[in-house]
Amino acid sequence: MEKLTTLTGVAVPLRRSNVDTDQIIPAVFLKRVKKSGFDDALFYAWRRDPEFVLNKPEYKQGKILVAGPDFGIGSSREHAVWALHDYGFRVVISSRFADIFYGNTAKNGVLAAIMPQESIELLWKLLDEEPGREMTVSLEDRTVTCGDVTLPFEVNDYTRWRLMNGYDDIDLTLQHEDDIIAYEKMRAEKFPFKPKTLPVKREPEQPIESAREGEYPDWQGPLADRGII
């Protein structure tokens, strides 16, 4: 996962509260089997309106989303964060986030920065005065700077540490790779009758044998060949 320490980019004012995950990405797009390519689905219904903020040329390259309170409520679809990230947003600022959405942001390289609603209103005012304006978010200092205005934001220490180091869940697990390998080696020696759980890439290719073939001496082949299915 890409590290996030300081980000300077176009800030987009989203003057809407109670934005739920179905508004961020409709359920119809959840049928996709990949984790990327959801940028076209972000705010899909709203983007059909020519006046929607993301349809304005000055916000096409938005990287920082300044949203209203209670952002990311609703169902716990991780796709909502994927869509924001794929579109280009690395930071979402709000006065309140849904808990599950907040947790998903850190796992996917997106900062959910919490600021008082008064600070959000001030940022909206500054952005309305100069559409397409850039802001700087410093995760190291926990500040947002827009022009001459610098405001603090909240982020817990653990989330800050993950984002600044670019650690997703797999990265965190691999920090204990030596311990995992040692345990699996011990497990294989002590309990040889149990299946191994090492990654497939560490195992030689094994021939696949039918369990039925060993269980039934009269096994004649696939069920289809025997007229059973």
Curated annotation (Swiss-Prot):
The record, for InterPro entries, names: 3-IsopropMal_deHydase_ssu, Aconitase/3IPM_dehydase_swvl, AconitaseA/IPMdHydase_ssu_swvl, IPMI_Swivel, LeuD
Keyword Amino-acid biosynthesis present in the record's keywords: the answer is yes
Q: Which domain of life is it from?
A: Bacteria
Catalytic activity reads: (2R,3S)-3-isopropylmalate = (2S)-2-isopropylmalate
Where is the stretch described as Disordered?
198-229
Gene Ontology molecular function: 3-isopropylmalate dehydratase activity
**Record GO biological process:** L-leucine biosynthetic process
Q: Mention any one GO cellular component term assigned to this protein in its UniProt record.
A: 3-isopropylmalate dehydratase complex
Query: Its pathway?
Result: Amino-acid biosynthesis; L-leucine biosynthesis; L-leucine from 3-methyl-2-oxobutanoate: step 2/4
Do the record's keywords include rRNA-binding? no
Q: Which EC number applies?
A: 4.2.1.33
Compositional bias of type Basic and acidic residues: which residue ranges?
Answer: 200-215
Q: Which UniProt keywords apply?
A: Amino-acid biosynthesis, Branched-chain amino acid biosynthesis, Leucine biosynthesis, Lyase
Family recorded in the similarity comment = Belongs to the LeuD family. LeuD type 1 subfamily.
Q: Which HAMAP family match?
A: LeuD_type1
- Role according to the record: Catalyzes the isomerization between 2-isopropylmalate and 3-isopropylmalate, via the formation of 2-isopropylmaleate.
Describe its assembly. Answer: Heterodimer of LeuC and LeuD.
**Can you say what this protein is called?**
3-isopropylmalate dehydratase small subunit
Query: What is the source species?
Result: Bifidobacterium adolescentis (strain ATCC 15703 / DSM 20083 / NCTC 11814 / E194a)
